[in-house]
């Protein structure tokens, strides 16, 4: 059994570690709040843009639109856009995205497609660069804002748009972590390009907020408030042709979709870090209890031994 000083030193070390993990949990919680505020600030533009496109869609058929972003072509080359974080200590967040990327890469390779990677986040970059003989990396981005901004999305959007328009790739898929709850964040695969020729699919949207219950953080999600007021009157006449409008608006729409994916991935990373640090704090608390019990037993044994020695010496 370790001596009393070693046990006492380890108890102090565990308690100090718990203070660090608890502080990291609180910092992650504050950043989740910032992510929430960023989503709310970007929502008006995103909603208005989607509704403008819906208005244009109602006046024409997207199938007849002469926009390269809507044209599906025979797929020979596929670009996978993988989104991870720059840092660790967030549970299996980065590992799950990397595994899903490798899985998707294998699925497409088995079908005979030529594949390249566009990587966002230092963890994905480091992992795949160390395996550069197996994977082709076209571009990489790191040191993004902890709460992604439109500038972050613009750089990645410009890269994949350039690839798609130059026909260097025939399809772009994004792999990121979809935020569900503090304990459930799943990596998903979605097609970014080409855009759906049937029009803009309006998915149910939600606003998430972080609250506290019983001294613990929880995530609550509410449906985004609906606003059905028409953006454009039915008698509005566009000076530009629908094709010109689409070619101007669709890149903005694509950038907005990528921004929302980055924001959701950031929220997932922060939630994973909160959970990981919370688990670490709980484990440190239990370990400190166990060490205290061990220390008390060792101290009691030492005292008992001293008493026995004193009694034994007195009897002699």
From Swiss-Prot:
Question: What is the topology of this protein in the membrane according to its UniProt annotation?
Answer: Peripheral membrane protein
Per the UniProt record, the source organism is: Prochlorococcus marinus (strain SARG / CCMP1375 / SS120)
Q: Per its database record, what is this protein's job?
A: Produces ATP from ADP in the presence of a proton gradient across the membrane. The gamma chain is believed to be important in regulating ATPase activity and the flow of protons through the CF(0) complex.
Protein name as catalogued? ATP synthase gamma chain
Concerning its family, UniProt says: Belongs to the ATPase gamma chain family.
Gene3D superfamilies reported for this sequence: 3.40.1380.10, ATP synthase, gamma subunit, helix hairpin domain
Keywords from UniProt, A to Z, are: ATP synthesis, CF(1), Hydrogen ion transport, Ion transport, Membrane, Thylakoid, Transport
Query: Could you tell me where this protein is found in the cell?
Result: Cellular thylakoid membrane
A GO cellular component term found in this entry reads: plasma membrane-derived thylakoid membrane
Keyword Methyltransferase recorded = no
What Gene Ontology terms describe what this protein does at the molecular function level?
Answer: ATP binding; proton-transporting ATP synthase activity, rotational mechanism
Which InterPro entries does the record match to this protein? ATP_synth_F1_ATPase_gsu (IPR035968), ATP_synth_F1_gsu (IPR000131)
The main location class comes to membrane
Q: How does it assemble?
A: F-type ATPases have 2 components, CF(1) - the catalytic core - and CF(0) - the membrane proton channel. CF(1) has five subunits: alpha(3), beta(3), gamma(1), delta(1), epsilon(1). CF(0) has three main subunits: a, b and c.
Name the PANTHER family on file: ATP SYNTHASE GAMMA CHAIN, ATP SYNTHASE GAMMA CHAIN, CHLOROPLASTIC
């Amino acid at each position: 059994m370790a001596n009393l000083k070693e046990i006492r030193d380890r108890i102090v070390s565990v308690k100090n570690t718990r203070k660090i993990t608890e502080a990291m949990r609180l910092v992650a919680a504050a950043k989740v709040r910032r992510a929430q505020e960023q989503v709310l600030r970007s929502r008006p533009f995103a909603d208005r843009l989607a509704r403008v496109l819906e208005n244009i869609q109602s006046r024409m058929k997207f199938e007849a639109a002469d926009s390269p972003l809507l044209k599906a072509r025979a797929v020979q080359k596929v670009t996978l856009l993988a989104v991870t974080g720059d840092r660790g200590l967030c549970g299996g967040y980065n590992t799950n995205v990397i595994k899903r990327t490798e899985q998707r890469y294998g699925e497409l390779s088995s079908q005979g497609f030529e594949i390249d990677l566009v990587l966002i986040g230092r963890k994905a970059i480091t992992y795949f660069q160390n395996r550069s003989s197996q994977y082709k990396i076209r571009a990489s981005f790191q040191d993004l804002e902890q709460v992604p901004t439109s500038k972050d999305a613009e750089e990645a959007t410009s890269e994949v748009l350039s690839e798609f328009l130059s026909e260097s790739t025939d399809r772009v898929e994004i792999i990121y972590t979809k935020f569900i709850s503090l304990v459930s964040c799943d990596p998903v695969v979605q097609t970014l390009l080409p855009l759906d020729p049937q029009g803009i699919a309006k998915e149910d949207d939600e606003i998430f907020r972080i609250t506290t219950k019983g001294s613990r953080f929880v995530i609550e999600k509410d449906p985004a408030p609906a606003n059905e007021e028409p953006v454009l009157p039915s008698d509005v006449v566009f000076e530009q042709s629908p094709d010109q409008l689409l070619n101007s608006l669709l890149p903005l729409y694509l950038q907005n979709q990528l921004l929302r994916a980055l924001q959701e991935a950031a929220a997932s990373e922060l939630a994973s870090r909160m959970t990981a640090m919370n688990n670490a704090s709980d484990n440190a608390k239990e370990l400190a209890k166990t060490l205290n019990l061990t220390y008390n037993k060792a101290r009691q044994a030492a005292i008992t031994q001293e008493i026995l020695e004193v009694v034994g010496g007195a009897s002699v």
